[in-house]
Amino acid sequence: MTHTVAVSGASGYAGGEALRLLAGHPFVTVGAITAHSNAGERLGALQPHLHALVDRVLAETTADVLADHDVVILALPHGASGALAAEIAERSPDTLVIDAGADHRLESAADWEAFYGTAHAGTWPYGLPELPGQRERLAGTRRIAVPGCYPTTSILALAPGFAAGLLEPRDVVIVAASGTSGAGKALKPHLLGAEVMGGMSPYGVGGGHRHTPEIEQGLAQAAGEPVRISFTPTLAPMSRGILATATARLRPGVAAADVRAAWASAYGREPFVHLLPEGQWPTTKAVLGSNHVQLQLAVDERAGRVIVCAALDNLTKGTAGGAVQSMNIALGLPEQAGLEQQGVAP
């Protein structure tokens, strides 16, 4: 059976990445392709790498255009998905709506209002299949909230330790470097090549980044209790990719062998998350353009901490690939369908 998939926000990075993956998906057909300010333009003028779709014309982003597809992927800025998703659901209740933006990720309305400053649109099933029990929640659902790129990286880095009861929940530090595509395609002076190339800079320092409560929410799900983190994102001079270094204090009596065994057990059968052989460390280049995640860990016995490094492509596993992976589960398709791409080297 072939499913028709519409993509909104197709002129942006996340929407373009979704189309790249869907164009090679064996069980879907790309339906409506929509945008806001770029409606009426030829897709090839904005996404020239999408050779199979270059002659498609971008439609207006409306519920009328998007409804009645089997699947709709909303690759829109935060605050733009909530009302549109509700309208699509009213017109076409059987459509699987996948929000690649932030609007439906957080369970806490108070956290949403504190970090985003608008009314909470509600909570949808969270599209991170590797979290304990999450595949069961995604199977058959008609609504999916795609995790943010930093939360995907950070949660995958530390969730096994929390799920196994090895980590203290209130002493967690995460520093993550991301490529500039994570900030979107809109022109911003601090993202100009002359500003970015040759240097790195932190931002959202001091607990102010909007992904902070989402990371805490995912880790709390794994831990079964609240988790508090200190999160510092950093802008790196590359177009795509995230490398996160996450550290947490070990509970008393936890041995280094227990730590590695917990991560190996959690991810040993996962198709996309890979604990590397000891001594080999993740690189963003190794996962470029793929839905794969590389992890490595070490125990700092002197400090009593575990250090986990995780690398993924923020546009693939961190956004569009995560959307397609969760879509596959919701539709009962093979989980790896359309996601067979390997990393690119050199």
Swiss-Prot record:
Pathway: Amino-acid biosynthesis; L-arginine biosynthesis; N(2)-acetyl-L-ornithine from L-glutamate: step 3/4
UniProt subcellular location: Cytoplasm
Presence of the UniProt keyword Amino-acid biosynthesis in the record: yes
EC number, UniProt record: 1.2.1.38
Disulfide linkage: none
PROSITE patterns on file: ARGC (PS01224)
Active-site residues, record numbering mapped to chain: 149
Keywords: Amino-acid biosynthesis, Arginine biosynthesis, Cytoplasm, NADP, Oxidoreductase
Reaction catalysed by this enzyme: N-acetyl-L-glutamate 5-semialdehyde + phosphate + NADP(+) = N-acetyl-L-glutamyl 5-phosphate + NADPH + H(+)
Single biological process term from Gene Ontology: L-arginine biosynthetic process
Any one GO molecular-function label of the UniProt entry: NADP+ binding
InterPro entries documented for this protein: AGPR_AS (IPR023013), AGPR_type-1 (IPR000706), NAD(P)-bd_dom_sf (IPR036291), NAGSA_dehydrogenase (IPR050085), Semialdehyde_DH_NAD-bd (IPR000534)
Keyword Cytoplasm: yes
GO cellular component, one term: cytoplasm
Pfam families recorded: Semialdhyde_dh, Semialdhyde_dhC_1
Purpose: Catalyzes the NADPH-dependent reduction of N-acetyl-5-glutamyl phosphate to yield N-acetyl-L-glutamate 5-semialdehyde.
Homology family: Belongs to the NAGSA dehydrogenase family. Type 1 subfamily.
Protein name per the record: N-acetyl-gamma-glutamyl-phosphate reductase
Gene responsible for this protein: argC
